[in-house]
Amino acid sequence: MDTTYWGRSFGVMLFKDAITKENLLKFYIKTETNYFYHQGIDQLQAKGYNVLAIVCDGRRGLLNSFDDIPVQMCQFHQAAIIRRYITKNPRLLAAIELNELVRLLPKTDKESFKGALFEWFNKWKTFLDERTINIETGKSFYTHKRLRSAYRSIKTNLKWLFTWYDNIELGIPNTTGAIEGHFADLKNKLRNHNGLNLKRKKRFIDEFLKV
């Protein structure tokens, strides 16, 4: 499940079956909230669908809000979070190594990644703990705050980054790539119809998504 936007106040939240590739449900929304994601899952279950697992982008509070359903965080979204903290081409050696490690996410297993992350942290722990003093206030702050935040993000989300591996028999995708590709195709086609008003745009989306 995932959401895409046109502008700031018109979006489509889509629920897709990863096995059959069928679009199951959609909402037109102004704001992406966890409430709508829960509403979607509830509606699907009420219709008789057996929700074996959920793949989502890792919104705050969403990953741990489904008590009885395995949740996989999209590994591409995790990589994007890291890039926002340390950029796509970091200069610090510690950041370069972390960036290279994150690139392995879709290609490795849980034990290998956890072991490599543990080794990275032990290697750079002293560096991460470095502090800088503000000469005007006398207060100190972490010198490499964004790198620390990048590491903390991975460490916090690690529980949900390998749900596919912990439940290998379910065949859970490790990304929301199928939906994102669908959204990209939809947006490309809509660019050829820029003059559509909201009502006609919704009609176009309805016909494209067939749900």
What are these regions (language model features)?
Residues 1, 23-26, 48, 84, ...:
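Residues at structural and domain junctions
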Residues 1-60, 64, 68, 157, ...:
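RNase H-like nuclease fold core
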Residues 5, 80, 190:
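A broadly conserved detector of short glycine/acidic/proline-rich loop/turn motifs that flank catalytic sites
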Residues 23-27, 37-42, 49-53, 78-81, ...:
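Glycine-rich loops and low-complexity Gly/Arg-rich segments
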Residues 49-60, 66, 100-211:
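Acidic/histidine-rich catalytic cores and adjacent linkers
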Residues 53-100:
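Conserved beta-strand -> loop -> alpha-helix junction used to position metal-binding or nucleic-acid-contacting
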